[in-house]
Swiss-Prot record:
The gene is gpsA. NADPH binds at residues 15, 35, 107, 139, 254, 276, 278. One of its GO terms (biological process) is glycerophospholipid metabolic process. It comes from Rhodopseudomonas palustris (strain HaA2). Catalyzes the reduction of the glycolytic intermediate dihydroxyacetone phosphate (DHAP) to sn-glycerol 3-phosphate (G3P), the key precursor for phospholipid synthesis. The active site is at residue 190. It catalyses: sn-glycerol 3-phosphate + NAD(+) = dihydroxyacetone phosphate + NADH + H(+); sn-glycerol 3-phosphate + NADP(+) = dihydroxyacetone phosphate + NADPH + H(+). Belongs to the NAD-dependent glycerol-3-phosphate dehydrogenase family. InterPro entries: 6-PGluconate_DH-like_C_sf (IPR008927), 6PGD_dom2 (IPR013328), G3P_DH_NAD-dep (IPR006168), G3P_DH_NAD-dep_C (IPR006109), G3P_DH_NAD-dep_N (IPR011128), NAD(P)-bd_dom_sf (IPR036291). Its EC number is 1.1.1.94. One of its GO terms (cellular component) is cytosol. This is Glycerol-3-phosphate dehydrogenase [NAD(P)+]. The keyword Transport does not apply.
Length: 329
């Protein structure tokens, strides 16, 4: 099994830059690919990302716009939005060596196809080994070397373990798993729950309401996970409960801050600040997938209704509070 001495990170945004720094700290030879010419030039000249001001890029990290050059690495971290992963994976297929791990670092479900990230990779880049990296991790924390733990999953246990070892550093601790579906499902589901938590905070409904929402949101995550074959220990782990807890508690989470703005009465366009949170795209897909399996997800239903304009925030909250009483699961 390869030790993955060379790693390419595709995407020079905040999270991509943070992971490139992490791989460099772990002793890997790192190439950072950025498709936008302006952003790439800034990375080269300023040695920092526009999205992480004040965090210097390690001198050993090579920045490139040449996808073929990046594709020569022994493992590639795909740090691109969930809704554009397909095009990137398709472009990589003719460039990568057989059995090259492509590790999705986005948390979402593809709109229109209901595909999870590793399913997209398997479909578009059959030469690759699909993997997923997820867990409670903010780019600013990781970039600055603050202690962080995540999960890396691949169906091949040896690959998952080798990838975890390759990214392991003094401050970044990856656990490995073969429950690919569970890991990516947790990350996608928490996006929607974080919007709900943000709405509660923005509406100033109090700490009790926020705790209740987060807890019942976790119940929905577990229900959905069971229906789609996730392991219970994964849902209770970093990529499930860990990520949910983090993103439902701080405006550092884009989904939470988006929800806060909605809770304060801002429009979706204003709340987005020019870039919609991933949970906006995940909510309707999550609901469709839950309905297909007969999974009850009232919080997700309420969020989807708010986002598509069928319900106002107050009506959605009232609807949740007036549901028939039931035994706690």
């Amino acid at each position: 099994m390869s030790s993955f001495d060379t790693i390419a990170v595709l995407g020079g945004g905040a999270w991509g830059t943070a992971l490139a720094l992490t791989a460099a700290r772990a002793g890997r030879s790192v190439t950072l690919w950025e498709h936008d010419a302006g952003n790439a030039q800034h990375l080269i000249e300023a040695r920092e990302s526009r999205f992480l001001p004040g965090v210097r890029l390690d001198d050993s990290i090579k920045v490139t716009q040449d996808l073929a050059e990046a594709a020569r690495a022994q493992a590639l971290l795909l740090v691109v939005p969930a809704q554009v992963l397909r095009s990137v994976a398709t472009s990589l297929q003719p460039l990568i060596a057989a059995r090259t791990p492509l590790i999705a670092c986005a948390k979402g479900i593809e709109h229109g196809t209901h595909r999870f990230m590793t399913e997209i990779i398997a479909e578009c880049a059959p030469n690759a080994v699909p993997a997923i990296l997820s867990g409670p991790s903010f780019a600013a924390d990781v970039a600055r070397g603050l202690p962080t733990a995540v999960t890396i999953a691949a169906t091949d246990a040896d690959v998952a373990q080798a990838l975890a070892q390759a990214m392991n550093s003094g401050s970044f601790r990856p656990y490995h798993s073969t429950d690919v579906r569970g890991v990516e499902l947790g990350g996608a589901t928490k996006n929607v729950m974080a919007i709900a938590a943000g709405i509660v905070a923005g509406r100033q409904l109090g700490a009790s309401a926020l705790a209740a929402m987060t807890t019942r949101g976790f119940v929905e995550l577990v229900r959905f996970g069971k229906a789609y074959g996730a392991r219970i220990e994964t849902m209770h782990g970093l990529s499930g409960l860990g990520d949910l807890t983090m993103c439902c508690s701080t405006p550092q989470s884009r989904n939470f801050s988006f929800g806060m703005a909605l809770g304060r009465g801002e429009s979706i366009d204003t709340a987005a600040h020019g870039k919609l949170a991933e949970g906006y795209y995940t909510a309707p897909v999550l609901l469709e997938m839950a309905q297909a399996k007969g999974v009850e997800m009232p919080i997700s239903t309420a969020v989807a209704a708010i986002l598509d304009g069928r319900l106002g925030v107050d009506a959605a909250i009232e609807g949740l509070l007036t549901r028939p009483l039931k035994a706690e699961e």
